[in-house]
């Protein structure tokens, strides 16, 4: 009797562990003809973690038009097809704004149907892999299409060199989702900007304009930014006007007071005097 109970408990534990394992993910990204990168995994839209097995993104989603958008989107856990995926299950699902829809992973359901939206717009998308739900709500920001929630600097000028396992993140501005910033030490060398931290060198990069170092282009010739002096820099990218600003940290700092201290003067080492 004890052995039977023990076996049953072990089976329950193993089943629970397998279910949790199938839902767990270190990364989640949106792929499909409803997003800018289409069906290219290296250009899928990276979602950011927002708790254990919860991911969020603000992203421009396009409605089905029968021409450029025929299917919608689904979710990948890596920038490749051979990975755990999440989709709509047995039939395509048109998401109701603010209403959670069920997620199905490709290990339990192989029908691979897609999610769709009624209107092209920026959406705040939340995927809860614990509850296996996806929710899309129209974003307050609609001025420009939002295609990324973070960017990453890569190159021998960065601390991580050309290693995609050690990218330098650029954080999205809380007030303007088209602006990304980083304060980081840069070495003498070159760099460019990735939009997918799992996409490797097959993805489309943000690159230096061939005629203007302060301008950014998306894709094209592999022109990089050159850092000529090692220092800590503030780097700001604005995708609304496709510009980049690279300046030394504290370059704008203005000193308006100096104080003399020491035993060579009357007040000695006293800060108050």
For the regions a language model picked out, list residue spans one by one.
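OB-fold nucleic-acid-binding modules
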Residues: 139-143
């Amino acid at each position: 009797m004890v052995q039977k109970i023990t076996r049953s408990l072990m089976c329950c534990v193993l089943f629970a562990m397998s279910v949790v394992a199938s839902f767990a993910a270190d990364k989640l990204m949106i792929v499909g003809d409803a997003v800018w990168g289409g069906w290219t995994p290296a250009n899928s839209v990276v979602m950011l973690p927002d708790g254990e097995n919860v991911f969020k993104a603000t992203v421009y989603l396009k409605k089905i038009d029968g021409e450029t958008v025929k299917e919608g989107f689904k979710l990948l856990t890596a920038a490749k097809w051979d990975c755990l995926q999440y989709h709509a299950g047995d039939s395509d699902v048109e998401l109701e704004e603010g209403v959670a829809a069920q997620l199905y992973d490709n290990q339990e359901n192989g029908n691979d149907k897609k999610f769709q939206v009624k209107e092209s717009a920026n959406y705040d998308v939340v995927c809860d892999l614990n509850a296996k739900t996806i929710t899309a709500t129209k974003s307050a920001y609609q001025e420009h299409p939002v295609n990324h929630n973070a960017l990453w600097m890569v190159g021998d000028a960065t601390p991580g060199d050309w290693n995609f396992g050690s990218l330098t993140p650029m954080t999205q501005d809380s007030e303007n989702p088209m602006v990304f910033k980083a304060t980081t030490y840069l070495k003498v060398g070159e760099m460019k900007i990735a939009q997918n931290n799992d996409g490797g060198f097959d993805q489309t990069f943000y690159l230096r304009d061939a005629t203007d170092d302060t301008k950014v282009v998306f894709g094209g010739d592999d022109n990089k930014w050159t850092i000529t002096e090692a220092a800590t820099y503030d780097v700001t990218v604005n995708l609304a006007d496709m510009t980049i600003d690279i300046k030394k940290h504290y370059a704008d700092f203005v000193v308006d007071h100096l104080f003399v201290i020491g035993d060579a003067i009357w007040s000695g080492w006293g800060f108050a005097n």
